[in-house]
């Protein structure tokens, strides 16, 4: 008898559209002849929580936020009310509850499973609705295997609460945990306690590992280059927008029922020193035929490509195929700001329905871009951004500060460069990320080259003891002698960027923002 699978998304992820992992794995396994079902418990549980504590008013607000007929601008006040309700639940009922995450901070730093297990055992706002929907899903699908995706720290507790319920009520069902968080954080796990909840932990893309678990011979090389998602079991009417800004680029992550696709597997560059390029799901680059991708775009109108970076040559082919078929679609996704994005290619993308791109400018400094092997320069990036602008394609830039050897002067030089991009309308949205050293990055393999020392290597006794009960390990502490005060610099960068997003302060210098931060600190006594 072949196994029957139920694939689950645990609480909590974004509310406007389903997280794609189960849809792609469902489509793949069904193509191999398996009985597979899926449920998004995240959206079901968060709706129940909000209605349980907000009553009829919350239900009416969610109905308004779910409606495609209500303009985004009219959803701003409703979004504010639902945000306030979520904060009230967090303050008065369950301090771990977040609108699209649960106990995220603890989960992100959980080297020891003990802190997580306390939250798993502690009853919180999700427990009752989660049990109700699990009971219903298992009764409907009668699975022999349940697979749970854990893409982010904010889904970790929810995933293990699912396992706790299934262990108690259906001990014969095999439990499997996979997803992005598992692939990056749990590769070095030595603690045995998580195995009392899950039977198996799968790393990287789930296609080949899941087939092996189900008893079939499979290697990564045997897997298809493109997998069409299956939407059976997804109720699109349950999802709702959260409109927190007037910035149209910034809204894309929280507004709209985007169907998520992957144009290519892995990253075609996979050289950035800060990235987890050692991991197979990033460095195994494969790209399908454009027709396969566009086939999956025939049944909808809005798509978000969740690639590490969409390959320009494939983007061209996909755009041409969309136009050849006469499809009326909108799409956006992640790119690298390199010279492949010519004005001609960007115009073609726009005609084919591309409305926005996101990409990394990182530290926005040529010395640092070279040091991190980013493969772009400020000049080449500006040319690409200008081409997107002229084609009417919006841009979000990922920014970084605190990179090893970065100076205060370079950080404020980057701020000035970014200010110029906003003033010229070459970017419409951005976000500063503070550099984090991850164990799977080239920097972690050769820290001396970047002027840093890995901090936990200093106390080998503690490190060896911790290794025996290690749960999560991805971000690792480091020491950089003489580094600037990145906490203080980060305040300045983030204040300036917040204003840029709203179209304010575009004539202010870095020194102006520094003075403003100092005045605020004096006024608040901090």
Predicted regions and their residues:
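Radical SAM enzyme core and accessory elements
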Residues: 2-10, 24, 30-31, 45-65, ...
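Hydrophobic anchor at the start of a short beta-strand
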Residues: 5, 36, 175, 303, ...
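Residue-level recognition of beta-strand->loop/alpha-helix junctions
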Residues: 40-42, 279, 399
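A structural motif corresponding to the C-terminal lobe/cap of the Radical SAM core domain
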Residues: 6-13, 20-21, 144, 198, ...
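Flexible loop/turn segments at secondary-structure boundaries
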Residues: 13-16, 45-46, 153-157, 183-185, ...
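Glycine-rich beta-alpha loop elements in corrinoid/cobalamin-binding modules
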Residues: 4, 12-15, 21-46, 104-231
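Conserved Radical SAM active-site core
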Residues: 44-46, 50-51, 58-143, 189, ...
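Radical SAM [4Fe-4S] cluster-binding motif and immediate context
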Residues: 232-394
